[in-house]
Swiss-Prot record:
Belongs to the SelA family. Homodecamer; pentamer of dimers. Binds only one seryl-tRNA(Sec) per dimer. HAMAP family: SelA. The keyword Zinc does not apply. One of its GO terms (biological process) is conversion of seryl-tRNAsec to selenocys-tRNAsec. This is L-seryl-tRNA(Sec) selenium transferase. Its EC number is 2.9.1.1. Pfam families: Se-cys_synth_N, SelA. GO terms for cellular component: cytoplasm. Keywords: Cytoplasm, Protein biosynthesis, Pyridoxal phosphate, Selenium, Transferase. Its cofactor is pyridoxal 5'-phosphate. The lineage of its organism: Bacteria, Pseudomonadati, Pseudomonadota, Gammaproteobacteria, Enterobacterales. InterPro entries: PyrdxlP-dep_Trfase, PyrdxlP-dep_Trfase_major, SelA-like, SelA_trans, SelA_trans_N_dom. Converts seryl-tRNA(Sec) to selenocysteinyl-tRNA(Sec) required for selenoprotein biosynthesis.
């Protein structure tokens, strides 16, 4: 160690002296003695590293309290930070998918604040079943005999297979062996459930005879998987759920379906692309149908299974059900969301997912033009601001080839340097409420479809 290094080390303050500084007293009141002391030890270690590597004091040496305050504030921020989603993807998996309705938010708050009748029967003063209230709602909406709730649709598929076909073959079309995010693959789930995959047909064409010929003494299920995150077009043939259900009845083999996104309303009435609905499959005779709670349904993350009472009973009694069951906050939010479907006339207004998906291109464009005029003075020296047509996507593997006409505010650097776009996007990500857009074709695009809180957006953009 050089004499210069020793001299610099000697200038570092003692923790005890810092703790008695008035600025640190206020930090101790706010964050606690233990947390502040731990931070000061780390700061001293950092300072020694700087001295050892650069032979200089750290640039924050003159104001330890301010540096400590910044570090404590950053550490206190939640890992789940609110952001402004202007990516153009409404159900953005990385940004938490569906926004919750106000009714769902209030229901969750109530469930957290007080004991609730999660598994308590007020009439009989004994133990109840946590899925009962939601099962009643789901049966009313879908026409099913019974229902089961777990924590996501992947869990729903796993439980469905494990409880009804473990040790048996499950017949699926090759064109429906989907993979979703996180490498969730139907063949892998079957293996985990103890089932044997029996593929039939080809990637683009599967016929009714393929299912019939595949059935043997070890067949447990016939399965349909909705290819919600990709599309096969051209020379294609699939067996519809109603026809497969008829085959199942003829051969006395249950038919189950994984719908993935799972919309509970006919989206075409809102000018959106059609998506198969659970109630249609139930009416067609499918024994069990699984779908997600946090995609097109617009609720919390959950896996929902509706279908025949006897088969739902198998699911409820399986050991996996307890491991996969939903908690009281999920159930509270899902119940409140499902109740909105009982008033379909107000659904597009009250359900955020549907409200955002049904925004007109004209209203989005008007909003973008109005906000662009207010932001021109802030960004106009470096960037050309324009309002351009764009296409939003639904996201989360829902309706993968369909796009929604929208409008975006675009930022193009006057000097044409792409690095300026990267720097601008990075700067927006450091805002107290980060603004998330996308860089494409030499521009930074802010798709306005999902912007509802204009005042917060403008506050962030003008910082």
């Amino acid at each position: 160690m050089t004499s210069e290094t020793r001299t610099l080390y000697s200038q570092l303050p003692a923790i005890d002296r810092l703790l008695h500084d008035s600025a640190f007293l206020s930090l101790r009141d706010r964050y606690g003695h233990t947390q502040v002391v731990d931070l000061l030890r780390r700061m001293l270690d950092d300072a020694r590293d700087v001295i050892r590597n650069t032979q200089t004091l750290p640039d924050w040496y003159a104001d330890w309290a301010q540096e400590a305050k910044l570090r404590l504030e950053n550490a206190a921020q939640s890992a789940l930070r609110p952001v402004i989603n202007l990516t153009g993807t409404v159900l953005h998996t990385n940004l938490g998918r569906a926004l919750q309705a106000q009714e769902a938010i209030e229901a969750v708050t109530q469930a957290m604040r007080a004991p609730v009748t999660l598994e308590y029967d007020l009439d009989g003063a004994g133990r109840g079943h946590r899925d009962r209230a939601l099962a009643t709602l789901l049966c009313r909406i879908t026409g099913a005999e019974d229902a089961c709730i777990v924590n996501n649709n992947a869990a729903a598929v796993l439980l469905m297979l494990a409880a009804t076909a473990s040790g048996k073959e499950v017949v699926v079309s090759r064109g429906e062996l989907v993979e979703i995010g996180g490498a969730f693959r139907i063949p892998d789930v079957m293996r985990q459930a103890g089932c044997t995959l029996h593929e039939v047909g080809t990637t683009n064409r599967t016929h009714a005879k393929d299912y019939r010929q595949a059935v043997n003494e070890n067949t447990g299920l016939l399965m349909k998987v909705h290819t919600s995150n990709y599309s096969i077009e051209g020379f294609t043939k699939t067996v519809e759920e109603a026809e497969l259900a008829e085959i199942g009845r003829e051969l006395d083999i249950p038919v189950v379906a994984d719908l993935g996104s799972g919309s509970l309303v006919d989206l075409s009435q809102y000018g959106l692309p059609k998506e198969p609905m659970p109630q249609q499959l139930i009416a067609a005779g499918v024994s069990l149908v699984s779908f997600s709670g946090d995609k097109l349904l617009g609720g919390p993350q959950a896996g929902i299974i509706v279908g025949k009472k006897a088969m739902i009973a198998q699911l409820q009694s399986h050991p996996l059900k307890r491991a996969l069951r939903a908690d009281k906050m999920t159930l509270a939010a899902l119940e409140a969301t499902l109740r909105l479907y009982l008033h379909p006339e107000a659904l597009a207004e009250k359900l955020p997912t549907l409200r955002l998906l049904t925004r007109s291109e004209a209203s989005i464009r008007e909003q973008a033009q109005r906000l662009q005029a207010r932001l021109a003075a802030r960004y106009g020296d470096e960037f050309a601001l324009e309002v351009k047509p764009c296409l939003s996507q639904i996201g989360s593997g829902s309706l993968p080839v369909d796009r929604l006409p929208s409008a975006a505010m675009t930022f193009t650097p006057h000097d044409g340097r792409g690095s300026r776009l990267e720097a601008l996007a990075a700067r927006w990500r450091t805002l107290p409420v980060p603004v998330i857009g996308r860089i494409y074709d030499g521009r930074l695009w802010l798709d306005m479809r999902c912007l509802e809180d204009e005042s917060r957006f403008m506050e962030m953009m003008l910082k």
